[in-house]
Amino acid sequence: MSKEQFIIAMRFLASSVSVISAKDQSGKLYSMTASSVTSLTIDPPSVLVCVNNSASIHDVLTQGKNLCINILQKNQQEISNLCSSKQRESQRFDNDFWDTSHVPFVKKAQSNIFCKVEETIAYHTHKIVIASVESSQSADTFNTLMYADGGYLD
């Protein structure tokens, strides 16, 4: 299968939009829009996130590190766009979208899932991050930002 055929096929996989966020030991904040986030196990609660080796957050996500998976609401496209743009990387936290007092998280997200990295697996161009879920908080109603076929869904 060609790379192009695979990309076209995957464009039909609709998913919620998530932003992964973390803070390094010096307090520097990191975030990225993630297209590959999934639950792994229910007992114990765990998740799997795939991170490109070239992503700035890549080196921060090591064993024992805390991170947050922020599942965005429909009105949070701007956060997704900020966190997916290398050109706007320095602007990602220059707004009031975030609580950065501990592990950074998006305020008013659909859900915030607070995790601890348990294991990472190198696979070609990506790192597979396996994390245990320590806590979560969610909105009362479903209003999740969805993405498919190269754009946000209504």
Model-identified regions with their sequence ranges:
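Basic, polyanion-binding surface patches
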Residues: M1-D154
